[in-house]
Structure formats: structure tokens, C-alpha cells
Swiss-Prot record:
The keyword Hydrolase applies. Its EC number is 3.4.22.-. One of its GO terms (cellular component) is synapse. The lineage of its organism: Eukaryota, Metazoa, Chordata, Craniata, Vertebrata. Residues 26-343 form the Calpain catalytic domain. CDD domains: C2_Calpain (cd04046), Calpain_III (cd00214), CysPc (cd00044). The gene is Capn5. This is Calpain-5. The active site is at C81, H252, N284. It comes from Rattus norvegicus (Rat). Residues 499-617 form the C2 domain. GO terms for biological process: granulosa cell differentiation; luteinization; ovarian follicle development; proteolysis. It comes from the Eukaryota. GO terms for molecular function: calcium-dependent cysteine-type endopeptidase activity. PROSITE patterns: C2, CALPAIN_CAT, THIOL_PROTEASE_CYS.
Length: 640
């Protein structure tokens, strides 16, 4: 994964460290200096900040003291509980934090070799489709010899402070981390995809079955190494950081550090009882103000759990900000969950393997409608199709598809007043099985995301077999920015961008001809087909000028619904389009009949019910069956 890591600001960690050791100096980062510019992008600085190296703060600095734990972290003066909550989640996953903090043993202070320390660290973050290696020096902002931002329980443990500094460097300054989104940090730590869940939507509070399904999904993400966060929405500025009677805090991001089904009871009998309780462990980045309801640290409910089970769960009575609660109570009090899924693309895994397609694009403005790529959402029908378009295929009868679009992070532009995200989203349309060019008219909408001014938008949906077009858009037309599209399917989806509006003219066009007409054929279904006692196993083939489109087989019915479309750019208008119906058999497929379609340039999408004919164009009495077809035809190749 990290062989393709890109050096941020072209700073090579190894080369910089070697140069410092050779010159016997401590590294000073020219790209993120120890100055107010690295602290603030606006406003008046507070108390005088002194930048100090760890050995100026304590006698025996360490990256880690007794390993790394979610208990290590405490939020500082900047309002970035979202980042600290993400760090708490990261600390609970060794395989993940060792990717963010590479070669940590080499970066650790070595008391036996003090001359090997050069005051330089580096950390890896996933940013807009690639891993970047961020170099920082070890000068940290302090007031009265105390770290003013993220810090550890132990005064001589420092891993979280330089990680935060590297993340602030990416954002432009520490102040740019104020008021962020936990989902963004979780993605930046893992390269996964974040799925936000609104616990107030639908009837989760009252529907036990839906609640149980969601718990299983949360448990699955946690058990497969994903990261999870939860929060209580603050509806007004006055609500921010308000403490509820139960001890929870509004507008605060909590890290989910464990998810499990807890066995109730004592002794051998407990192993044979089926009673288990769905429970969640969370942590407040402040390290205090914890849950005081049922199953809190000193709650009598813990008497229902055996001592061995409590030890296995790590239940302690400490004011460390970590606490257990039932999943039911979590759904009652919390309003939002963020699941960061680590998408498994390894063929060697025992778990489900996904195929990922990753494409970059952009919303760009242009006066020419055919070159404009910033058309806004579907509300703007005149310009909607002037957006980037991406086509992909679902090759199974039905497949779960994960789709995420991300806009380039903008925190680093806050200094110029440009740090706000665009409102973005996307629609997915089922299109013709042979489409190769951009859409110009509406087709069946298969799914759509919400529109929100967040860095990324995610959708998980089930799609039947076929070809689809994703149209990612900004909410309003005319807005510009870069985008990253990620599509995950069970088998390769052949996802690619549609760039051309119509077939290109080449040097052969004058010899072989150029299309004069575009025709869309939509075969909806059939009725009254010749069948056996179990019904026909039929499919259709649409033929036009040597090109074929075939539907899936519809089994065991004489009234199949094919719902298959083909689009054809036609040169020989006198040749009819043929729709053939076949019966799928073991040895040889059986021809059931066909119809010929003759079109005119002004044909609309009228529904035609046509009787099947034999190959000679006759309609014998022993050839039953009717095919329902819609045809759309135009002399303008960009009409469909």
C-alpha cells in the first residue's frame, strides 16, 4: 500500500533526517514554521505561545509509554474533538495506527543513542485517493510549559501531538481543524469509506428488527477492523457541548472502542443460556463526563455479568472517559453514527472481497454546453446532463454496490476564505446495455444519494444486472472543483468516464458512412409465449446493423418482463431493427419468433404491442406471442 506514498510538499523524510544528522542539527520545517501562521488563519492570538521540543517539556520524552491506547488522548484548546475521537478509534487498531505512524520504532527516542535523534517525524494520511507522507519537526505549541492541543495522559508520551501537527499542516494551520467531521479523519487514517447513519430517521427507536439489523452491521464493521464514531446533534450554537442529565455531551464526537454481545449470568449455566445483550463501549475525547445511566462504570447492572466476562470486556471503574452502554440506549440518546468501512480488496481474505474502481474528475465551467461539466443537480433540467458521467456494469443477477464521491479537501484554503465544501451528490440511472456515449435525456433512476456540503457522499444500494450511469453533481450549476469517484462491486464493473456525446467522425466516415439517426429500443416484456408445462425460459435479442443486445433469461413464465434497452447509431435507415424471442434449452435454444421495427426520425416513445412472426415475416397460427416494445428515434444523435 505504501510503496506509492507521495511525499507531501516534496519533503523526503529519510533524506531530511540524514542531512540533519550529518550536520548535527535538529530539523526545522520551513513549510510549517513555529509561528502564529501555523496556529491561526484569522482572529487575534490568545496567550503567548511558546514552541518547545519534547525534551524541553519533560526529561524522558517517548512516542509511546506502555504501548498505544485510546486512553492516551485528551482534547486541547482547539475544537477538534472530531479529530481526537478519530485518533482514539485509531489507537485501538494496531494494524491501522502502524500505517499512519510508519517505522515507529525508528522514529522513537533512543536513550542509548541520543545522537540518532534529529527532531523530525513523518506520518501517512490518505488524501483524495492517494497516501501522502507528511514531515513535521518536533516543535510543539505550549503555554506555561503545557501542550495546548492534543496531549496524552502521560506527560512524557507524545505520539498524538506530532500526528495532530502533521494533520494541521495538511489543513494549513491548527485553527483550520476547528469544527471538522469525524468521518473525514477516519477516512484519512484508513483509506476506507465512511457511511453516516442518522439514528433519528425512520423508526429505529421503535422497530426492534431494524435496530437489530443495524447492530449486526455495526458489529461487522468493528469485527473486520473498521472504525466507528457516534455523536448527539446540537441543534443550536447554545446546545454545543451541553451536558445531558445522563452525562452525555451534545455536539461531541465519541469514539466507539468496542462492540459486542455480552453474555448475562454466572457460572457454567451462563454458557448454556441464550440471553445476550448488545453493548457498545465509547470514549469521550475530554477523558471525563461519561455516561451515568444503566451499565455505567459503577452501575449495579454489572452484577448480572460474571467476573470473567467483565475482565474480558475490560470493565474498570476509572474516570478515563470510557464507558459501556446498551445498544438500545445508544439508539435512544445518540443521533448519528459514522461507520468507516475498510473495503477488503485482497483475494487472499476469508471475508468478502470487493472490486474497486477509482476515477478522478472535475466539475468545470465552459461556455460551450458540450464542454461544460458543471450543470448542477436534477432541479436544473436544462443543464443537468452537462455534468461528468461515469458508466459501470453489474454483472450478477443482483449485487450490493458501494459508491462514494469525494471533493478535494478545502481546509487548507480557509485562510483565503475558500474553505467551505460544495453541496454535492449523485444520481444513478439504468441505461441501455450497449451505451457507449453520454446521456442526454432522462432514463430510469435506479438510486440517488443525498445532497450535502460534506467532503464525501456515500451510498450503499442493491442493483439488478445491467449497465448504469452515475452523474455526480454540485447542487447548484456553475460551481467548480475536483472529484474522486469510488465504486465497489462484487465483480469488476468496467467503470469508466463517458467523454463523447456521439460517435466520433474519423477518416473512414466518408467511406463507410456516418450515423444519420439514433434509435433507442426498449423491450418491456412479452405475453402468450409458446411454453412447456413449466413455462418458457425466454430471452430477447435486439439486432441492428450487425450489433446485438441480449436480455437475461426469464425462467418459468410465458409472460416475461425483459426490461432491456439497446441504443443504435444507424447508417442504413432502410434496414429494419429485429427483435427476436428465444427459449433457453439445454442442448439448443429454440426460436420462438421475431418482429421487425421500421422507424422514422420523429418516432416518440409510444408503446407498441407486436405479434411474433416467423423468420419469413409471416404470422402462423401456431406461433403465439406478443412483444411489448417502445421505440425512440431522432435525427439528432444527442437526443437520447
Amino acid at each position: 500500500m505504501f510503496s506509492c506514498t507521495k511525499a507531501y510538499e516534496y519533503q523526503n523524510y529519510s533524506a531530511l533526517k540524514r542531512a540533519c544528522l550529518r550536520r548535527k542539527v535538529l530539523f526545522e520545517d520551513p513549510h510549517f514554521p513555529a509561528s502564529d501562521d501555523s496556529l491561526y488563519y484569522k482572529g487575534t492570538p490568545g496567550p503567548t505561545v511558546r514552541w518547545k521540543r519534547p525534551f524541553d517539556i519533560c526529561d524522558d520524552p517517548r512516542l509511546f509509554v506502555d504501548g498505544i491506547s485510546s486512553h492516551d488522548l485528551h482534547q486541547g484548546q482547539v475544537g477538534n474533538c472530531w479529530f481526537v475521537a478519530a485518533c482514539s478509534s485509531l489507537a485501538s487498531r494496531e494494524s491501522l495506527w502502524q500505517k499512519v505512524i510508519p517505522d515507529w520504532k525508528e522514529q522513537e527516542w533512543n536513550p542509548e543513542k541520543p545522537d540518532s535523534y534529529a527532531g523530525i517525524f513523518h506520518f501517512n494520511f490518505w488524501r483524495f485517493g492517494e497516501w501522502v507522507d507528511v514531515v513535521v519537526d518536533d516543535r510543539l505549541p505550549t503555554v506555561n510549559n503545557q501542550l495546548i492541543y492534543c496531549h496524552s495522559n502521560s506527560k512524557n508520551e507524545f505520539w498524538c501531538a506530532p500526528v495532530e501537527k502533521a494533520y494541521a499542516k495538511l489543513a494549513g494551520c491548527y485553527q483550520a481543524l476547528d469544527g471538522g467531521n469525524t468521518a473525514d479523519a477516519l477516512v484519512d487514517f484508513t483509506g476506507g469509506v465512511s457511511e453516516p447513519i442518522d439514528l433519528t430517521e425512520g423508526d429505529l427507536a421503535t422497530d426492534e428488527a431494524k435496530r437489530s439489523q443495524l447492530f449486526e452491521r455495526v458489529l461487522k464493521v468493528h469485527s473486520r477492523g473498521g472504525l466507528i464514531s457516534a455523536s448527539i446533534k446540537a441543534m443550536t450554537a447554545a446546545d454545543m457541548e451541553t451536558r445531558l442529565a445522563c452525562g452525555l455531551v451534545k455536539g461531541h464526537a465519541y469514539a466507539v472502542t468496542d462492540v459486542r454481545k455480552v453474555r448475562l449470568g454466572h457460572g457454567l449455566l451462563a454458557f448454556f443460556k441464550s440471553e445476550k445483550l448488545d453493548m457498545i463501549r465509547l470514549r469521550n475525547p475530554w477523558g471525563e463526563r461519561v455516561w451515568t445511566g444503566p451499565w455505567s462504570d459503577t452501575s449495579e447492572e454489572w452484577q448480572k455479568v460474571s467476573k470473567s466476562e467483565r475482565e474480558k470486556m475490560g470493565v474498570t471503574v476509572q474516570d478515563d472517559g470510557e464507558f459501556w452502554m446498551t445498544y438500545e440506549d445508544m439508539c435512544r440518546y445518540f443521533t448519528d453514527i459514522i461507520k468507516c468501512r475498510l473495503i477488503n480488496t485482497s483475494y487472499l481474505s476469508i471475508h468478502k472481497t470487493w472490486e474497486e474502481a477509482r476515477l478522478r474528475g472535475a466539475w468545470t465551467r465552459h461556455e460551450d454546453p458540450q464542454q461544460n461539466r458543471s450543470g448542477g443537480c436534477i432541479n436544473h433540467k436544462d443543464t443537468f446532463f452537462q455534468n461528468p458521467q461515469y458508466i459501470f456494469e453489474v454483472k450478477k443477477p443482483e449485487d450490493e454496490v458501494l459508491i462514494c464521491i469525494q471533493q478535494r479537501p478545502k481546509r487548507s484554503t480557509r485562510r483565503e476564505g475558500k474553505g467551505e465544501n460544495l453541496a454535492i451528490g449523485f444520481d444513478i440511472y439504468k441505461v441501455e446495455e450497449n451505451r457507449q456515449y453520454r446521456m442526454h435525456s432522462l432514463q430510469h433512476k435506479a438510486a440517488s444519494s443525498i445532497y450535502i456540503n460534506s467532503r464525501s457522499v456515500f451510498l450503499r444500494t442493491e442493483l439488478p444486472e445491467g449497465r448504469y450511469v452515475i452523474i455526480p453533481t454540485t447542487f447548484e450549476p456553475g460551481h467548480t472543483g475536483e472529484l474522486l469517484l469510488r465504486v465497489f462491486t462484487d465483480v469488476p464493473s468496467n467503470c469508466r468516464e463517458l467523454r463523447l456525446d456521439e460517435p466520433p467522425r474519423t477518416c473512414w466516415s466518408s467511406l463507410c458512412g456516418y450515423p444519420q439517426q439514433v434509435t433507442q429500443v426498449h423491450v418491456l416484456g412479452a405475453a402468450g409465449l409458446k411454453d412447456s408445462s413449466t413455462g418458457a425460459n425466454s430471452y430477447v435479442i435486439i439486432k441492428c446493423e450487425g450489433e446485438k443486445v441480449r436480455s437475461a433469461v426469464q425462467r418459468g413464465t410465458s409472460t416475461p418482463e425483459y426490461n432491456v434497452k439497446g441504443i443504435f447509431y444507424r447508417k442504413k435507415l432502410s434496414q429494419p431493427i429485429t427483435v427476436q424471442v428465444w427459449n433457453n434449452r439445454v442442448l439448443k435454444d429454440e426460436f420462438l419468433g421475431q418482429v421487425h421495427l421500421k422507424t422514422a426520425p420523429d418516432d416518440l416513445q409510444d408503446l407498441h404491442s407486436l405479434h411474433l412472426q416467423d423468420r419469413s415475416g409471416r404470422q402462423p397460427s401456431d406461433l403465439p406471442g406478443i412483444v411489448a416494445v417502445r421505440v425512440l428515434c431522432s435525427a439528432s444523435l444527442t437526443a437520447v
